Amino acid sequence: MTTLDQISTLTQPRHPDDWTEIDSAAVDTIRVLATDAVQKAGNGHPGTAMSLAPLAYTLFQRTLRHDPNDTAWLGRDRFVLSAGHSSLTLYIQLYLGGFGLELSDIESLRTWGSTTPGHPEFRHTKGVEITTGPLGQGLASAVGMAMASRYERGLFDPDAEPGASPFDHYIYVIASDGDIEEGVTSEASSLAAVQQLGNLIVFYDHNQISIEGDTKITLCEDTAARYRAYGWHVQEVEGGENVVGIEEAIANAKAATDRPSFISLRTIIGYPAPTLINTGKAHGAALGEDEVAATKRILGFDPDKTFAVREDVITHTRGLIARGKEAHERWQLEFEAWAQREPERKALLDRLLAQQLPDGWDADLPNWEPRSKELATRAASGAVLSAIGPKLPELWGGSADLAGSNNTTIKDVDSFGPPSISTDEYTAHWYGRTLHFGVREHAMGAILSGIVLHGPTRAYGGTFLQFSDYMRPSVRLASLMDIDTIYVWTHDSVGLGEDGPTHQPIEHLAALRAIPRLSVVRPADANETAYAWRTILARGANSGPVGLILTRQSVPVLEGTNTEGVARGGYVLGDGGSSEAKEPDVILIATGSEVQLAVAAQKLLADKDIIVRVVSMPCVEWFESQPYEYRDSVLPPSVSARVAVEAGVAQCWHKLVGDTGKIVSIEHYGESADYQTLFREYGFTPEAVVAAAEQVLDN
């Protein structure tokens, strides 16, 4: 437990020479607004916003290069509040700095329809770079932002001296004890060191208090030493009021261009609340009227007034608007000089900012003849990437140590990273395109989000579908933000085979389809895979993340597949003898490797004079977004005899087959065997589909 003497020492102010009384008043105003806002809401997190007031003020008013009038400015520094529970740390700065929030928004904290929700939300509040709240995600995504910054520099201004390009900027992060405890930050921080991300500066709010109180009960490591071991540049600043130490640490971090920087800032949560300071009660609850009043007295505020902001304080802090405009104008001159020097790269930037694809980008997409050699859809995906890679320099990505299995490597490109990490297999270049995430699936998901949020490139990452479980928090957050991340998930069923049930996805398709706004795309063959990539890349901006689900095993190249049908999510692959004058007797709906089973079953049923429609349904989400007229044309409401076939749990198919339909599925874990044996033993055969069809017809 921190002693009273330590608290006294850690709360002694140290201000730079140009710090004024107005600056101190602004910092105290931040503290009072935090207590008032949480008190009015009845819940929230006041303590961190109080103790981090000097840091937040120093960053927003004295450090960050940003423009309140243009929060999408290409040259801005990025700020990530990984400690999203302390949303007031960010909201109050957005108010003081003139980014669009007003005092009434602070008063409306955590209420219906407000622009100040409990945790910061991307697009919901101007000036928020990323949705945070699930701890660890922000720091991990900031690693992606730093990687994106370097890659984009390579696209647009690779020959500029360090710090001399209009594309050079910093990524600042505030992380909490909780962030540090989350595993995703360990994964991402390790990779950040490998990548030598000198543009990433992380402030660790080391207050040693969480909801359950003193973190001694859960966190006893030397965190600074851990980050030194990763290979970060590490500094320790004693005291949250130590603005001199904070600014010196920032200057030192900027000078350490060969590695990311970690600044451990020892703060006292809830300062200067008289009785709840340095307690868990200051972390996640309103302080109470008496404590708020006492805090105001300590700071020289009228305890009977709420949300009090001196006119000279807001005038002073809104000076950031003019300073930001001036910084933007200086940058604009550098940018225009660059544009004159680099017209071709400027044209590329314009295309990417307009979110357009170049003419003919898909002209070389591979096409496979029906009944040609069978091919795994993961292999087809790899062929697609290598075909479109030369035309889409904005597309980059890799795998969580499964590149050869996921087929995620674009042919003939370097790996992304400092040349010193090159191996016999891979040549690394600062601006390479192939990403090596290592066995860090969770970090990969968050890093992909950071890359896409930073903009304007497109990033993808691959692993086995079973390991999407490790990525789920990042995938959900990407879906919440509606950002265009691409996940390549291969080895998509018991068809994985001999590795056995630990690696065989069973419930994963249903679990992923349960995530709102995530599109789960499972193509039936090589051509549907190419069509899926075309659709994914051609969709409009902010269409949400996509999971591309691919087979390990080879599958036939089918007749009748088409790009428009894939783009619509589901379509009639074959009608088995029916015509407009005759509806099918039964509809077989299938995805992925099971479409071939439906096609084979259709032929067997035709021998029995049963008219069968086969519907390929690569993406349920895309299909359900189509007009009713189209959906009814594919699945006529008058045909209630329906069978769905998918090598996963049946959970999501009931709504399409109805109460009278049947689902050929797997409701248990698999075993270690070759995929042919598993499919046969688990009933994924044409004969099993025929039996299901006959049963629904009998009913």
UniProtKB/Swiss-Prot annotation:
Recorded catalytic activity of this chain's protein: D-sedoheptulose 7-phosphate + D-glyceraldehyde 3-phosphate = aldehydo-D-ribose 5-phosphate + D-xylulose 5-phosphate
Free-text remark on how the cofactor is bound: Binds 1 Mg(2+) ion per subunit. Can also utilize other divalent metal cations, such as Ca(2+), Mn(2+) and Co(2+).
Site feature Important for catalytic activity, where: 45, 283
InterPro entries: THDP-binding, Transketo_C/PFOR_II, Transketolase-like_C_2, Transketolase-like_Pyr-bd, Transketolase_bac-like, Transketolase_BS, Transketolase_CS, Transketolase_fam
EC number: 2.2.1.1
Name of this chain's protein: Transketolase
Family membership: Belongs to the transketolase family.
GO molecular function: magnesium ion binding; transketolase activity
Residues binding substrate: 45, 283, 378, 405, 491, 499, 552
RNA-binding recorded as keyword: no
PANTHER family: TRANSKETOLASE, TRANSKETOLASE 1-RELATED
Active site (UniProt): 441
Disulphide-bridged cysteine pairs: none
CDD domains the UniProt entry points to: TPP_PYR_DXS_TK_like, TPP_TK
Enzyme class, spelled out: transferase
Residues reported in the UniProt entry to bind Mg(2+): 177, 207, 209
UniProt keywords, alphabetically: Calcium, Magnesium, Metal-binding, Thiamine pyrophosphate, Transferase
Subunit details: Homodimer.
Cofactor(s) the protein requires to work: Mg(2+); Ca(2+); Mn(2+); Co(2+)
Binding site for thiamine diphosphate: 48, 85, 133-135, 178, 207, 283, 467
